[in-house]
């Protein structure tokens, strides 16, 4: 019946809204772990808690996503400039094909950490972070707090530059 469908939709909407609140600025990050290119599970926590990393960008993307690939030059510029100063990227691909995922990483010289369950949007990280569209990202500080969300273009470079100057 229509009432049941509406109820199900409302329940999903409510759950998504509650999950989104858990990933607001000021909230602690939610740990995730996915396989890297070698098939080894890499947890976000291990990257955030690494003393060398002052800020970690949790970046959700896919090779088929035009806007995601449009962000790559900005990510590369920021990573190349600040990785030795404490900036790391934990890239989570929403690709469903391993070859597409790893091919995009290689072709675009995306030389930071990449993980993927190779399940598209049907992956645990998408649920944990209430991801409904990509590109999407979360900037996490060394204490594990989300300090910014969805930094695009020059905004990412400017924010990291500002934070690392403090």
Tell me what each language-model feature is.
Residues 52-56, 135:
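Alpha/beta-hydrolase fold active-site loops
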Residues 37, 71, 94-99, 103-107:
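Long, His/Glu/Asp-enriched segments that create or flank divalent metal/ion-associated functional microenvironments
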Residues 1-42:
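Oxidative protein folding and maturation machinery
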Residues 60-77:
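Conserved redox-active cysteine motifs that mediate thiol-disulfide chemistry
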Residues 44-51, 126-129:
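Short amphipathic alpha-helix with an adjacent loop that forms part of the alpha/beta core around
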Residues 110, 117-165:
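Thiol/disulfide oxidoreductase modules built on the thioredoxin-like
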Residues 57-58, 89:
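Hydrophobic beta-strand anchors of alpha/beta hydrolase catalytic cores
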Residues 85-100, 110-121:
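Thiol-based oxidoreductase modules, predominantly thioredoxin-like and allied folds used
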């Amino acid at each position: 019946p229509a009432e049941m469908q509406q109820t199900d939709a409302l329940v999903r909407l409510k759950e998504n809204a509650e999950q989104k609140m858990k990933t607001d600025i000021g909230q602690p990050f939610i740990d995730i772990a996915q396989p890297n290119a070698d098939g080894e599970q890499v947890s976000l926590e291990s990257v955030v808690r690494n003393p060398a990393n002052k800020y970690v960008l949790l970046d959700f993307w896919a090779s088929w996503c035009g806007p995601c690939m449009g962000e790559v030059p900005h990510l590369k510029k920021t990573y190349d400039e600040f990785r030795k100063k404490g900036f790391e990227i934990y890239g989570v691909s929403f690709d469903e094909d391993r070859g597409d995922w790893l091919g995009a990483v290689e072709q675009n010289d995306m030389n930071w950490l990449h993980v993927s369950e190779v399940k598209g949007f049907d992956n645990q990280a998408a649920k944990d972070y209430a991801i409904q569209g990509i590109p999407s990202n979360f900037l996490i500080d060394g204490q594990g707090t989300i300090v910014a969300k969805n930094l695009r273009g020059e905004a990412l470079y400017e924010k990291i530059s500002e934070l690392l100057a403090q």
